[in-house]
Swiss-Prot record:
GO biological process, alphabetically ordered: branching involved in labyrinthine layer morphogenesis; cellular response to hepatocyte growth factor stimulus; cellular response to lipopolysaccharide; chronic inflammatory response to antigenic stimulus; defense response to bacterium; defense response to protozoan; interleukin-10-mediated signaling pathway; negative regulation of autophagy
Residues modified by glycosylation: 135
GO cellular component: extracellular space
Listed InterPro entries: 4_helix_cytokine-like_core (IPR009079), IL-10 (IPR000098), IL-10/19/20/24/26 (IPR020443), IL-10_CS (IPR020423)
UniProt xrefs under PANTHER family: INTERLEUKIN-10 (PTHR48482:SF5), INTERLEUKIN-19-RELATED (PTHR48482)
Name of the featured protein: Interleukin-10
GO molecular function, one term: cytokine activity
Amino acid sequence: MPSPALLCCCLVLLAGVGASRHQSTLSEDDCTHFPASLPHMLRELRAAFGRVKTFFQMKDKLDNILLTGSLLEDFKGYLGCQALSEMIQFYLEEVMPRAENHDPDIKDHVNSLGEKLKTLRLRLRRCHRFLPCENKSKAVEQVKSAFSKLQEKGVYKAMSEFDIFINYIETYMTMRMKI
């Protein structure tokens, strides 16, 4: 007859296998339903951006465009995955932390926008079909370089064009859903 310790170990092992199998099913289900939930996630991003859009666009006095057509072409091309991944990282790590410090009245709204973008990134990473990439995007490098050259004004420029970024996300995701 097996010892109680051995029985306990077997039960723990079986519970772990069952839980991981259940988790795998949940993850697959999330990915199955992800295309249907994407429009809602994009609406939430747009609504969150709407709370800070006027502030940043009023502060953006520059005539140039940071998020150019070449970035959209990267989103549409074979580098779409990498461009999207890098741009999400760029906004989360470089733009939004600096944007939060510009006015206490918008800090919570920028933070909320960042949390929604993090949620989107997490969902994209879980569903490898949408973010299976490794290569670097030259267009993203150009955006980052232009952003750096603009110094403090770069935050206003990048945040004022966040709606363009949302549109690029939508273009990329729409293309990936057709695959």
